[in-house]
Amino acid sequence: MSPLSPAEVQIEPKVRSSLQERGELEALRFKWIESEKAGYDLGEMAVRQWIGRYWQRFIRQKWLEHLYGETCWVEFDPRAFGILRRSHLLESPLTETILEHFRWGEENLHIIQWAMDAGQPMDEIRVILTTLDVNSSRVPCQFDPARPRYRTAAG
């Protein structure tokens, strides 16, 4: 990996967080809420349910936080941290539109199809998509629902 440029050093994060740790805590919170509703401990099944329902959305939201420079997630490329603040991408109105598509869970192909249908400038779309690189944000869930490290969802 190449060293950080001067622009990247200026927004070097003070705190780095782990998607796996935060995801596990979110899954345990979900388990607690669902267990309270059911009246008994749903256990590992509830954690697996959270992973199936929410992991991808959770990762997408955290990826956007990483791009905006809000939170540095160690599983994402450190060079992408704050890229929206230090690049000229936000000067293009298309960038926010594309980011909104990503917030909805869409992928590059959906965005390219939308851009073609809407007659958007494809060269600019390609530059934005290449810079954002949504494909690098694919992080599999690695914590084991059968063996949570945390015993409670609080804190």
Predicted features and spans:
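Polar low-complexity intrinsically disordered regions
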Residues: 2-155
